[in-house]
Amino acid sequence: QCAKNKITALLEKKIGTTVSIHKLSITFPKEVVLTGVYLEDQSKDTLLAGDTIMVDISMFKLLSSSVELNNIDLRGITANVIRTLPDSAFNFDYIIKAFASKTPQAEPKDTSGGMTISVNKINLDRIRIRYDDAVTGNDVTAFLGHFDTKFEEFDLEKLKFRTPDIALNGLNVKVRQTKAISKDAQ
């Protein structure tokens, strides 16, 4: 409870919008579970809400520049991604800016070989995503009842992925395209 409250307060102070987490559960060294997650955008609309976000991660591998996600399980997720004019900013850009370094930094020399990322299993249940982009004229709403897969190969560097089976159920996508609005029209 204490960790959840500190994380929520820190995030709210950093990004300046409402952040709510009903429960945080960490089982070292592997599992992080968030339940009752809510994140508001600067217009006080829902940016992200979720019943359960569970990530099974090999935390000790982080010490050797490796992110190994054994299982990602998302349930009851709603995400609203919106881009508007005149600034053509997304409704989550303020979060990126809040965590970005305020001082310019010199390009570090890459001597580590980079961070490797691997994903084993993904399970998604009751996912709703709204993408409303006034700049490109795309308005997409998607609902996914269920999706799960297990990767045999996951190579982000080469964009090479192999999965023997994908289970997909209850996919409903609505796309509305309008003429893209140029900045000059504003």
Task: Tell me the role of every PLM-derived stretch.
Residues T17, G36-Q186:
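Secondary-structure transition motifs
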Residues Q1-G16, T78-N80:
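N-terminal type II signal-anchor transmembrane helix
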Residues K13-Y38:
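Short extracytoplasmic
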